[in-house]
């Protein structure tokens, strides 16, 4: 059971990307910070917004990279290397095209599935992909040529509400994730109906 030491929320920086589908991971970390009473602050050393809270006597760090999505690994590696956090103690929250809005799944390892943020993190860790992922469903536009505009667009209210509900449920499961009780966290999260 590997306990989480770092939670990363992927997204793009700037007001033009706020509330876009691609920023679902960043929204999750913002919600964690709010629930834990943590103020995220910019730190140039880690190329992101960072925060920290205590869980059962140990530090858990939060990170939202302020690099663009395809350079997320620069931020994650900078913080993880400084604090000597192994990939298996990292949870990366990100948007997932291949799942409908309102669904969330946990996974350890695997490829990047075309997600540029995951691709860069894996590359920065020297192809070590043992970090955990919280995959937040955003749906698919139905045509691969429409993906870029889709992920960079804002979801209609009904989809956004589903995403926010699944993030709230993931927050309920967070204590198990933090403790490394991955099987129990997966059972709870994966049994939820969107």
UniProtKB/Swiss-Prot annotation:
Q: Where is this site: Stabilizes the basic form of H active site to accept a proton?
A: 95
Sorted alphabetically, the Gene Ontology cellular component annotations on this record are: cytoplasm
Q: Which InterPro entries match?
A: Pept_tRNA_hydro, Pept_tRNA_hydro_CS, Pept_tRNA_hydro_sf
* Top EC group: hydrolase
Kindly state the subunit structure of this protein: Monomer.
The record describes the protein's role as:
Hydrolyzes ribosome-free peptidyl-tRNAs (with 1 or more amino acids incorporated), which drop off the ribosome during protein synthesis, or as a result of ribosome stalling.
- The protein, known as: Peptidyl-tRNA hydrolase
Organism, as annotated: Azotobacter vinelandii (strain DJ / ATCC BAA-1303)
Name of encoding gene: pth
